[in-house]
């Protein structure tokens, strides 16, 4: 199905009005595939990188379902969205409220880190859609404070991370409590891994599988290039100069190791760049504080690892900077997908040392993008990059095939060709065998 406008999804005027207010005009790849399947009441198993509109891909069908089938009297939630973290739950709920702002639908959250009495309104008043974390919700279910019998649609967001954090059993218990539901949607950053596959098989019924990467049209909105660096110190200088000269208004700097996050952030601050950082083991209040600083403009850039940045939803990111290249091309797409959202343009740059060119080559081949090198005046590299911009890399499978072919060749050459002599073949008929047994 080739849908170019949201109107073609048969969404209600209230939802279309909200989309227009948010600045959305064209559906993303994941939305084009997931929304029609979900609106046909099929179970959906979806995967898409961060920044591809995944949240709206499941919220729009859920909200449309509530509008298509209005309840006759107030009651407990009909849509339940499970997320692995409180932070992500708050972001999903915020987006749901924005999409439902012109309706009378009620949105609520149930998460840890909130006093018990603060959730009283969720239990005692009418709720249409609830976003929750598994641990706290299961506690309320066991205490019979949350009624699962009215849940018609169960949605898992970032299911892979939910399993990694050890919430698999809690999630399955909640799914069992919502056994009267009509539909289940499961979204994940990746659909790989035995644990996730088994989890999905147990919870979904003949799902429509949606594995949508951002289309090349979407990626064209992102200007991409890289800088060749001589060393880590050279990378820091390039990064600082780039932030100062490229009008970075709201940027995310990605690094590999969490122990480097604080150090790089402090280095940038010493150079006069307003910076904050995120690392995996930070307290929730510290994480929220760092994110709020970027959103409010107190800082210009946020330094983060891929793990620490999972689930963060920040609008209007002008630049994504790969201080360290990721090990996989998938992760690269996840990173750059945080800019150029909602039809806007963005920039993604990488800082590449000589030993990174294998990774750069993988990214080029996977994304089919032409990434060109640029130079910052006064910070030209002293070393030359590998020929043709990348190191020729051979995969393990290719190495195994090459080795196998070599061994076969050796065996063939080892076999001596038997010379057929006339005396061994003459007068051979039905009753006489060759005198040479090798013939």
Curated annotation (Swiss-Prot):
Residues 237-387 form the Helicase C-terminal domain. Its EC number is 3.6.4.13. One of its GO terms (biological process) is ribosomal large subunit assembly. Residues 394-403, 412-439 have a biased composition (Basic residues). A motif (Q motif) lies at residues 4-32. Residues 381-393 have a biased composition (Basic and acidic residues). One of its GO terms (cellular component) is cytosol. ATP binds at residues 48-55. This is ATP-dependent RNA helicase SrmB. Keywords: ATP-binding, Cytoplasm, Helicase, Hydrolase, Nucleotide-binding, Ribosome biogenesis. It catalyses: ATP + H2O = ADP + phosphate + H(+). Belongs to the DEAD box helicase family. SrmB subfamily. InterPro entries: DEAD/DEAH_box_helicase_dom (IPR011545), DEAD_box_RNA_helicase (IPR050079), DEAD_helicase_SrmB (IPR028621), Helicase_ATP-bd (IPR014001), Helicase_C-like (IPR001650), P-loop_NTPase (IPR027417), RNA-helicase_DEAD-box_CS (IPR000629), RNA_helicase_DEAD_Q_motif (IPR014014). HAMAP family: DEAD_helicase_SrmB (MF_00967). It is found in: Cytoplasm.
């Amino acid at each position: 199905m080739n849908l170019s406008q949201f109107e073609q999804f048969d969404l209600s005027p209230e939802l279309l009005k909200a989309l227009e207010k948010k600045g959305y005009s064209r559906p993303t790849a994941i939305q084009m595939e997931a929304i029609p399947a979900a609106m046909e009441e099929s179970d959906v198993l979806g995967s898409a990188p961060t920044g591809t509109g995944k949240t709206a891909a499941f919220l729009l069908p859920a909200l449309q379902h509530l509008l298509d089938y209005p309840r006759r009297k107030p009651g407990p939630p009909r849509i339940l969205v499970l997320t692995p973290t409180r932070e992500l739950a708050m972001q999903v709920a915020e987006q749901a409220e924005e999409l439902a702002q012109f309706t009378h639908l009620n949105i609520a959250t149930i998460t840890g880190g909130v006093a018990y009495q603060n959730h009283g309104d969720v239990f005692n008043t009418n709720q249409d859609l609830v976003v929750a974390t598994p641990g706290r919700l299961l506690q309320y279910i066991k205490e019979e404070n949350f009624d699962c019998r009215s849940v018609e649609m169960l949605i898992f967001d970032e299911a892979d991370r939910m399993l990694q954090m050890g919430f698999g059993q809690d999630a399955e218990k909640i799914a069992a409590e919502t056994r009267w539901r009509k539909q289940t949607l499961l979204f994940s950053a990746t659909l790989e891994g035995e644990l996730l596959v088994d989890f999905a098989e147990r919870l979904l019924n003949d799902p429509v599988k949606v594995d949508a990467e951002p289309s090349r049209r979407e990626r064209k909105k992102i200007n991409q290039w890289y800088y060749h660096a001589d060393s880590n110190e050279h990378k820091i200088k390039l990064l600082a100069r780039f932030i100062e000269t490229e009008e970075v208004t709201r940027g995310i700097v990605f690094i590999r190791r969490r122990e480097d996050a604080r150090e790089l952030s402090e280095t940038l601050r010493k150079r006069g760049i307003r910076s904050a950082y995120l690392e995996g083991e930070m307290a929730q209040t510290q994480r929220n504080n760092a994110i709020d600083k970027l959103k409010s403009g107190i800082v210009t850039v946020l330094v983060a690892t891929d793990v620490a940045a999972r689930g963060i939803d920040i609008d209007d990111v002008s630049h994504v900077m790969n201080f360290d290249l990721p090990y996989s091309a998938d992760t690269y797409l996840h990173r750059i997908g945080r800019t150029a959202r909602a039809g806007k343009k963005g920039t993604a740059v990488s800082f590449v040392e000589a030993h990174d060119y294998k990774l750069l080559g993988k990214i080029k081949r996977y994304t089919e993008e032409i990434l060109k090198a640029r130079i910052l005046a006064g910070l030209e590299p002293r070393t030359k990059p590998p020929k043709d911009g990348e190191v020729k890399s051979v995969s393990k499978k290719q190495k195994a095939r090459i080795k196998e072919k070599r061994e076969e060749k050796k065996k063939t050459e080892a076999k001596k060709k038997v010379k057929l002599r006339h005396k061994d073949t003459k007068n051979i008929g039905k009753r006489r065998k060759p005198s040479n047994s090798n013939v």
